[in-house]
Amino acid sequence: MNEENTDGTNGCSKVRTGTQNEAALLALMEKTGYNMVQENGQRKFGGPPPGWEGPPPPRGCEVFVGKIPRDMYEDELVPVFERAGKIYEFRLMMEFSGENRGYAFVMYTTKEEAQLAIRILNNYEIRPGKFIGVCVSLDNCRLFIGAIPKEKKKEEILDEMKKVTEGVVDVIVYPSATDKTKNRGFAFVEYESHRAAAMARRKLIPGTFQLWGHTIQVDWADPEKEVDEETMQRVKVLYVRNLMISTTEETIKAEFSKFKPGAVERVKKLRDYAFVHFFHREDAVAAMSVMNGKCIDGASIEVTLAKPVNKENTWRQHLNGQISPNSENLLVYANKEESHSKSLGKPPTLPTRLNGQHSPSPPEIERCTYPFFPGTKLTPISMYSLKSNHFNSAVMHLDYYCNKNNWAPPEYYLYSTTSQDGKVLLVYKIVIPAIANGSQSYFMPDKLCTTLEDAKELAAQFTLLHLDFNFRRSSINSLSPVSTTLSSGTPSMLPYTSRPSSYPSYPLSPTISLANGSHVGQRLYISNQASFF
């Protein structure tokens, strides 16, 4: 421990010696009865607390705390977080110098206490002018395994992963959208703990590990979205996956209406999955239990309640399952143990104005700045000489996509209308000249935006979706097609196959839809289809 640390409590700069630090921590331990141990760059207070019997608290009981002053320690932090409830474990990340690393994890005994901590302590002024951030901590136990031979079955993948890694609980494998006898070339491997998943990733990550003669790709799977129980109790939409490409919305509606005619409000289908809207929640829940595992057009379907995207402004970007602990921005992330050296975290790519819509996040992109020293040699290049993972916006991806297919650049046409409350609303129509004579003459989302940037980004996302451009970590399920998808006669295209998410989601609150054209300006194309949500 350092001999001296600067304590800025009450806005003054006073020096607290290492001996004083130690005395303060010992006093805290004596007062609470908790043990404290330092290991692997973190100091653990409790875990379990005195008198605890039984297993640790379940997933969802831990919160992440960011932007902690570097000279603040458990004797000051623990009393603050005890206001929300009983602390099971407090883990403060530490530097070799004895300072903390600016962030910590607090595990409560119940989920309710963790949620209360987020509500009352996020943006809490811990010292004059110093505000901490508190959000849910996602304990990721799932790895993404890519480049798997498509003919391998779930049992084969499970057996192989158990041979090469420890703690494997389950493997999630999804059938191909076009051939249900094959997998999609990737799987999600569930481990018994985050530590087991981290050890497996460490073993497999070098890039030289092979399964069945194939060099596999390994990364943290995107953590499943946590939605509070109160919100889920209002969900009336089912997410249906593993459908045949040829299955129509009419067929899906008919199948889900069999148990109670008239219960289904509408169906929206994209490729091999769909959202089934019900008028009443109880009918949705009943249909889920009846239809899960049933066959439609020869395909065994999976049915779950669709998870809304939280419309609140949260920090959600993670870097390979890990936050940047030095960042001044608070980031929700998936991994908890290994530090990340980058000092500038990746900001959200598209604001919550689009209600959960996010620009494509290319594989392993790193958003950070580096020093630009005088005399640094620079070489002129074309953006088209770069790889797709150098672009972060859908607009740039679409331009890149067209160039790689030897198409002319996309043409953007801006339209506007005025809302009932007088706001100017915008939407872009995109024309791709190379395919304009095909079955899809243009692309236009059925949502209106209030800013030019959002309108352009949304239109590009919509277009990429209908060009079979798969986003790696985005959910763009609220976009409805304007007309039929591209025909098989479309000019050959360079595919951009990316890692899909392991969970469904949909916007909790939609942007303004074009489905009702009563207030739409004269120049605006009006979609005759209702929006997703």
UniProtKB/Swiss-Prot annotation:
GO terms for cellular component: cytoplasm; nucleus. The lineage of its organism: Eukaryota, Metazoa, Chordata, Craniata, Vertebrata. SUPFAM superfamilies: RNA-binding domain, RBD. Disruption phenotype: Male and female mice are infertile and show meiotic arrest in spermatocytes and oocytes. Severely impaired spermatogenesis with a complete absence of postmeiotic germ cells and a marked decrease of spermatocytes in meiotic prophase I seen in adult testis. Spermatogonial differentiation is impaired in developing testis. RBM46-target cohesin subunits display unaltered mRNA levels but have reduced translation, resulting in the failed assembly of axial elements, synapsis disruption, and meiotic arrest. This is Probable RNA-binding protein 46. GO terms for molecular function: RNA binding. Residues 61-139, 141-223, 236-308 form the RRM domain. Gene3D superfamilies: 3.30.70.330. It comes from Mus musculus (Mouse). Pfam families: DND1_DSRM (PF14709), RRM_1 (PF00076). It comes from the Eukaryota. Essential for male and female fertility, playing a crucial role in regulating germ cell development by ensuring the proper progression of meiosis prophase I. Regulates mitotic-to-meiotic transition in spermatogenesis by forming a complex with MEIOC and YTHDC2 which recognizes and down-regulates mitotic transcripts for a successful meiotic entry. Required for normal synaptonemal complex formation during meiosis, binding meiotic cohesin subunit mRNAs containing GCCUAU/GUUCGA motifs in their 3'UTRs regions and positively regulating their translation.
